[in-house]
């Protein structure tokens, strides 16, 4: 957050709870904050192991910009803003389509009259296990992408 002193607008970082049991924290917080846009930061599954479910997201190929998942379709403006930010920041990125599951953005897009919402995901193997695995470069690139998006969005 300290790197966002030059952002052209207010930025709220929300660390919510109860995502796995109904997106409760995201829903109530988005209602209270009433943001112009919302970007959820989450992890997503990968399909880069022989016994993994087929999925076009791989570890080490950059953060994933969500197109859709089992509970939401990313708002086109937010999705395109994240893609443009990745290009401006010079970071690799992947497009994510998750057939099941969802993220906090699904709840945030439904509050009040609707909040344009999207999601930036960190590719992760073995989600919801004691041995989750991410590529450190994907995390650093996600931070660069997000900072660029927040500094340049209008």
Enumerate the predicted regions with their spans.
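Alpha-helical metal-binding/catalytic segments enriched in His/Glu/Asp
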Residues: 1-20, 142-147
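Secondary-structure boundary elements
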Residues: 1-12, 34-36, 88, 154
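Solvent-exposed alpha-helices and their adjacent loops that cap or buttress functional pockets
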Residues: 4-8, 30-33, 57-59, 111-113
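Short, conserved beta-strand edge motifs with alternating hydrophobic and charged residues
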Residues: 12-16, 38-42, 96
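Acidic, glycine-rich active-site loops and adjacent beta-strand->loop/helix elements
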Residues: 15-21, 44-45, 124-126
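Metal-dependent peptidase/peptidase-like ectodomains
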Residues: 24-92
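Active-site-adjacent substrate-binding region
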Residues: 64-137, 143, 151-153
């Amino acid at each position: 957050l300290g790197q966002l002193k030059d952002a052209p607008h207010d930025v709220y970082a929300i660390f919510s709870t109860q995502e796995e049991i109904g997106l409760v924290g995201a829903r109530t917080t988005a209602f209270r904050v009433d943001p112009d846009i919302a970007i959820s930061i989450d992890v997503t599954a990968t399909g880069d192991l022989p016994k993994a479910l087929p999925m076009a997201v791989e570890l080490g190929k950059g953060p994933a910009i969500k197109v859709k998942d089992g509970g939401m379709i990313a708002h086109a403006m937010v999705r395109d803003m994240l893609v443009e930010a990745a290009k401006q920041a010079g970071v690799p990125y992947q497009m994510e389509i998750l057939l099941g599951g969802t993220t906090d953005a699904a709840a945030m897009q439904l509050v009040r009259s609707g909040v344009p919402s999207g999601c930036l995901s960190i590719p992760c193997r073995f989600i919801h296990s004691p041995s989750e695995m991410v590529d450190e470069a994907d995390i650093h690139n996600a931070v660069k992408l997000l900072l660029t998006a927040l500094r340049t969005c209008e």
